Amino acid sequence: MSGNKSKVIAFNYFGGKFTWLDYLYADFPVNFTHLVDVFGGSSVVSLNYKGNVIKTANEINSDITNFFQVLRDNEDQLIRLLLLTPFSKKEYNECWEVSDDKVEQARRFYVRVRQSFFGLGAHRKNKGWHMAKMHVNCQGGETLSRWNNAIRKLHAVADAIRLNFQITEFDYLQCIDTIDFENAFFYCDPPYSRLSRKSYNDYKFEFTDDDHYELATKLNQIKGKAMVSGYDCSLMNEIYKNWRKIKLPVKKNNIRSGKVQEIIWMNYENERENNLFTNY
């Protein structure tokens, strides 16, 4: 595993796969030419993939697509505004007001998602402002230093989204239908099935059981290849029963105050040798 220090991330996001990237990439297929991140979220999967392919980050949440477009087109202006933004509960609360200015709306979204607990401020105000209280590091308050460091690292994110990277705002069915061809690879990280989690309304656009069935039906008809992430549960095992299934290592989960295990389902066979140590 290459570790996470060399990877880029714009913001934390509920269900994000930043700590799982090496495991996911190890089971990506070979010889695809278009990576489609169908439920993009923070887009860490497509942002960090190094293969020479077209990369499409699709996300239906307009706050997220606006943020990435503004970062791409107005990088210096947005980062300067964020560096001038205080780590403040008052600021956090005020950033829930919608702005007609795209740059200001991108700044407000970033404040919400980065100054909240576990990135849940992307759309849930009741998750609250993440105040620094006890934890310190060499730069002072850990929460504060993370805020400042994350803003400075946005330059690297901006560079990444200018390289073979396109942003779309389709619903998942339209995204798949629009791009599907033999060399397309769809990475799908839909909202976790409610059968596999205790909390609800964690996403701006939740997924019902019918949505999961609809996605699986569509993926079973595609010309390309697909990988689906989720937690182990009866629903996912039923709708992907004919797919290859791999259990990833158990990891600590701060939101759940326990441990979780991600599962991936694939409609293709293992195509790599010694896949956990493959360079990609």
Model-identified regions with their sequence ranges:
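Long, positively charged, glycine-interspersed low-complexity recognition regions
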Residues: K204-Y280
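Short, solvent-exposed coil/turn elements at secondary-structure transition points
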Residues: G41, L173, P249-K251
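Structural beta-sheet core signal
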Residues: A57, C188, A226-V228
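SAM cofactor-binding core of SAM-dependent methyltransferases
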Residues: A26, N31-E97
